[in-house]
Amino acid sequence: IAFSAVLHYNTKSSRISAEIPNQQKGSDMKSHFTPHKDITGTLSILLATLCWGFSGCSGQYLLHDLALPTPVVLCIRQISAGIILIALDLLFRKSTQRHASCRSSIRTSKKDLLILIFFAIFGICLTQYTFFMAIYYSDSGTATVLQYLSTILIFLVTCVRTKTLPTKTESAAVLAAVAGTFLISTGGRPGNLAISGYALLFGVICAISYSTYTLIPGRIVRTYGAKYVVGRGMLISGILLSLFVRPWTYEIPLSSEVILGFCGLILVGTAAGSTFYHFGASLLSPVKAGTLANFDPVSSVLLTALLLGTTFTATDLAGFFCIIGAVFLLQLCRGRLT
């Protein structure tokens, strides 16, 4: 249903935009975001965040309950997700006939190809590895919330680049994120670690690498499209990681639990999540789409507690609230720096 909706919307949008004269496009864009599209887009992105949260729970299930090796799970996930995103990219491009000339140009542009490889290694591979290690040493909810500290890091980098001082609201958001990290890591007791030191280490590295994941591919994403770049980046990172991990040397039981776990991790988290998000984003303004996507850590915490029975203390929840609230504040303020 999601695939059909996206194809129908993209085809219809392309046909309509081709029929509108240039002098009328500015006025017609004001009426682009109708109430019906707003509701549909909002629900689609919220469904995407639930898919991402369920994907994290599936990863935790594979690592904790089924005790599968983290590097092997990551190799399978990266290669499978890369193939799925490449297939979705080809499907959407074929239906809309957009960027047809861009598809092969990245292989002929040495600079773009190097950026893609750098992005695959230091953006995707490092982010995913540290994220899954954070899940291994803690849980999906905590790992996801710590990963979203990347929003704070990206904001600070943007302030330095634009030579802009943060406003009082933005400063409060940064302080809230720091306070949230303190509460999660110490339980509110200085000198005491409430979570594994490795979980905190990998969570912070994940936030840093996720900032790289967001900032590095900006130009090539604008040129080739998000699914084109991320799909190929995931496939490259999965292949390179497999050369070191050699997943074929491990014996992975093909039980129904393992298969269902990987289906949740790959099909729900990647295929369904990506489809719902891009469909919703096509119906909403960029700011609203980005703000709604920040419900990802909320869904991760809720699903981890409901599906896997993970318990969180009041201090944990307070820390989650501080970080997630900071992310929403900065998302709402981001237009000032963009």
Residue ranges and their predicted role:
Residues 2-4, 8-76, 192-219, 239, ...:
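Glycine-/small-residue-enriched transmembrane alpha-helix faces in small-molecule transporters
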Residues 30-31, 78, 185-186, 258-260, ...:
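C-terminal-most transmembrane helix of multi-pass membrane proteins
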Residues 37-42, 66-71, 75, 108-112, ...:
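Juxtamembrane helix-entry segments on the extracytoplasmic side of multipass membrane proteins
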Residues 49, 76, 124, 142-149, ...:
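Helix-helix packing/entry segments at the starts of transmembrane helices
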Residues 62, 73, 134, 139, ...:
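Hydrophobic/aromatic residues within transmembrane alpha-helices
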Residues 84, 89, 150-175, 298-318:
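C-terminal transmembrane-helix exit sites in multi-pass transporters
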